């Protein structure tokens, strides 16, 4: 998993509340267990018309936002089913950070396991960031995970809270496998000692 330390990128505004995982990645794209290739299905029912053509009104189809790495979204982002394909689709598209006032718990935790930083902010801060993100190609934010701060295009700074363990995992690029490997030496030591003390086990 790629480390997340500091990210400077275009932020796309998506001021819609209760965006569920089916909206993030429709069920038609859930037939695979691969984490790659799902970016094409991200927000498919909003990004594309019924004939498959792009919906020019959707933010990620607008000039300046096509390569957005940050999403500024409405309240309760990621609600609905627990499909892990939702963060997979975001990451495959290129989104590394989602900012909202709240997230569904399962989606929130799945983001950390896949190298995405979900940031919770107060409504007044979200409103400010939504305004910043509405500047099109100039909608650049800097997310500094080490200092837990968001720097806006006008020089303003917003601080955010984050669990120390989750922050540690993102800063060091540790998913569940990475965490296990980090403890590999301790595991080997325990197994050797256990085999010596309990050879019958």
Curated annotation (Swiss-Prot):
EC number: 4.2.1.33
Catalytic activity: (2R,3S)-3-isopropylmalate = (2S)-2-isopropylmalate
Single GO MF annotation: 3-isopropylmalate dehydratase activity
Pathway given in the UniProt record: Amino-acid biosynthesis; L-leucine biosynthesis; L-leucine from 3-methyl-2-oxobutanoate: step 2/4
InterPro entries reported in the protein's UniProt record: 3-IsopropMal_deHydase_ssu (IPR004431), Aconitase/3IPM_dehydase_swvl (IPR015928), AconitaseA/IPMdHydase_ssu_swvl (IPR000573), IPMI_Swivel (IPR033940), LeuD (IPR050075)
Entry annotated with the keyword Lyase: yes
Keyword set, alphabetical order: Amino-acid biosynthesis, Branched-chain amino acid biosynthesis, Leucine biosynthesis, Lyase
Biological process per Gene Ontology, one example term: L-leucine biosynthetic process
GO cellular component: 3-isopropylmalate dehydratase complex
Keyword Lyase assigned: yes
Any matching Pfam family: Aconitase_C
Top-level EC class as recorded in UniProt: lyase
Source organism, top-level taxon: Bacteria
Subunit structure, interactors included: Heterodimer of LeuC and LeuD.
NCBIfam families (alphabetical): leuD, PRK01641.1
Membership in a protein family: Belongs to the LeuD family. LeuD type 1 subfamily.
Function, as annotated: Catalyzes the isomerization between 2-isopropylmalate and 3-isopropylmalate, via the formation of 2-isopropylmaleate.
Protein's name according to its UniProt entry: 3-isopropylmalate dehydratase small subunit
Organism in which the protein naturally occurs: Brucella canis (strain ATCC 23365 / NCTC 10854 / RM-666)
